[in-house]
């Protein structure tokens, strides 16, 4: 069986106006040496007022401003692609510029529509993001690859293999329908060394452009792997501009260890709780489709630094507390357990929403109540009426920060829960809730989300990690 690597390069990997592309070219040449290669692109970054911004965010701002009746200009996006175009050789430059102009023209039409209709949503929003971001970048990267003597091609939207449901702005992958649309991509895999495709973007069966949630390019890579894992020896490679370490380097500076292996469960939890490793829904989709596929996270600047994500890691001899992470802006719903069953079923089947954790229940006045930790407080606020409709006596606590300790083998750590809670107390923070489950080796600590409380808690627990004894 031939090898196939699905490599995703995110916005930070592509860099400001494509500054990371020379490194990407080196990685592509290495990856394609013994494998077929599909590249999944995110939108590039640019700089506005001295700050790095994704072109996705730039376009979202333009769309909202246009919908508010303001005059907007696409000049920052146009200038970014003009800079990237300089990496295309003379032989391919005219054709590449034509594609850029055509797609940015289509994105501009979406802004004009938003301005006239007073709204920037659904397919108008999806088209603007596709034509100014991921889809356009995949075509531009194709011309850059060709300019460097790489046999490459890209996938047009007409041949798009990722088919989704009708939830336009937060869509869901449909395997059976997608599996019927992979012939064009499969033919290109056989014909070329490298194929580029935009991440984050899908299409309905009727041809309407859709988008995943933010971070959805990871899902695109996973979905392509799911579609081809029986045809090729398939691996997902998420190329990052840094290594996976035991805490966020922006929060913790000292005693950080490289994390060499993670289970699917550990990677999913880390993603849910704020570590930018992999979109947890990508792991969920791999599991739901019954696929056992290797996923790696590679530091593209130091490719020897790799984190392997597997269903069951081969080596469990390392530190059992692999990662300490946390998330701000969470909310906790307290709801009668009988009503919670209906809510959870509705979230799964109707909303297709899974960014929550079910905490341990409690009993009061003879009634059992469930506690549901939502990892996006803003989502709950937007849908508060819907959430509370399942139980008029339910209550929601906002402004909750959550710290979690991650490691399937944490049962090997002596007194881990008490040590973690003690360190948070030493940092002067009050624990509002704590949930520890032996079955999942999961420890969740809830505190008030104010100032830098979450960062302080992560720092406090991580400082104890190197001193912890384990069996």
Where are these regions (language model features)?
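Phosphate/diphosphate-binding loops
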Residues: 264-299
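A conserved regulatory-domain signal marking ACT and ACT-like small-molecule sensing domains
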Residues: 305-471
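Glycine-rich beta-alpha junction loops
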Residues: 44-45, 161, 242-244, 299-304, ...
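Nucleotide/pyrophosphate-binding catalytic subdomain
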Residues: 1-278, 439, 445-449, 469
